[in-house]
Design a protein with these regions (language model features):
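Conserved catalytic core of the tyrosine transesterase superfamily
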Residues: 1-278
């Protein structure tokens, strides 16, 4: 089998094993990108040096680990070579707090956004705190206007959840639908007739372009708007347990990171000295 046939087999086997659609799409995108860059005609022609060189192209540790997992799983499922690249260590996770934008910086990005589709992307990521994979897989039927919620189906960990449908999104989504007439998925790729979904790389590029145009001099990464969304919710006084549910976190400890990266919270703390007459 060639690479394309192996990839199709990879997809079918992941479906058979009941992987979530987000995981299937994520791993498939990673594998396709990897083999495009490798320029090899068969998976067996890939060696450890090829993979190490490819992974070093990514500055983000999480991105490296994501591609590493996808490649490892591909060789396990398709070629039965579970330990083929066992000597390639995973990039070590760092404990640095994620970079977030201020509300003013987010506003600048919206102000310079003239493309309707790009504004929908930015709005959904920021208003709902969606993961990029969740936005890519979002269908029109998932948007429940009667209850003002968006249903996130088979999210990370194969769990469903709901997030709020912000009233400001309604007219924007209506305008978008009338202009693009997308059918199943809210976002379509470059060939709408084939109902191809948007790619995660395309969404990251949109965020990068908007931040650059807005003069935001901070590092842009895939989950930037998600982190901004929840950090700003914390600053607005939203209960951390509610944010945990919106984020789809299994533990509130994961959500607590947003209290650590919120600089505004510190300035809002009332010192007990405030009640003392000096």
């Amino acid at each position: 089998m060639n690479i394309s046939e192996h990839t199709d087999n990879f997809i079918q086997e992941m479906k058979r094993r009941n992987y979530s659609q987000n995981t299937i799409d994520n791993y498939t995108s990673c594998i396709k990108h990897f083999f495009e860059q490798s320029k090899k005609d068969h998976p067996k022609n890939i060696n450890e040096t090829d993979i190490k060189t490819f992974l070093m192209n990514f500055k983000e540790v999480n991105t490296q680990r994501n591609y590493h997992s996808a490649i490892k799983k591909f060789y396990d499922i398709c070629l039965g070579q579970k330990n083929k690249f066992r000597y390639i260590p995973y990039a070590k996770k760092n404990n640095k707090l994620p970079i977030v934008l201020s509300v003013e910086e987010v506003q600048k990005m919206f102000s310079v956004c003239e493309n309707l589709k790009h504004k929908v992307i930015l709005s959904l990521l920021y208003s709902c705190g969606l993961r990029v994979s969740e936005l890519i897989n979002l269908k029109w039927e998932d948007i429940d206007r009667s209850r003002m919620v968006i249903n996130i189906i088979q999210a990370k960990g194969n769990k469903d959840r709901q997030v709020m449908l912000t009233p400001e999104l309604i007219p924007l989504l209506e305008k978008y639908w009338h202009q693009y007439r997308t059918k199943e998925y809210v976002l379509n790729g470059q060939n709408p007739e084939k109902q191809l979904k948007y790619s995660d790389r395309s969404i990251l590029e949109v965020i990068k372009q908007l931040s650059s145009k807005a003069g935001v001099n901070k590092r842009v990464y895939t989950h930037l708007m998600r982190h901004c969304s929840f950090t700003h919710m914390v600053e607005n006084g939203t209960d951390i347990n509610l944010i945990q549910k919106l984020a789809g976190h299994s533990s509130v400890k994961t959500t607590a990171i947003y209290t650590h990266i919120s600089h505004n919270l510190i300035s809002k703390i009332k010192s007990p000295l405030s009640n003392i007459r000096l």
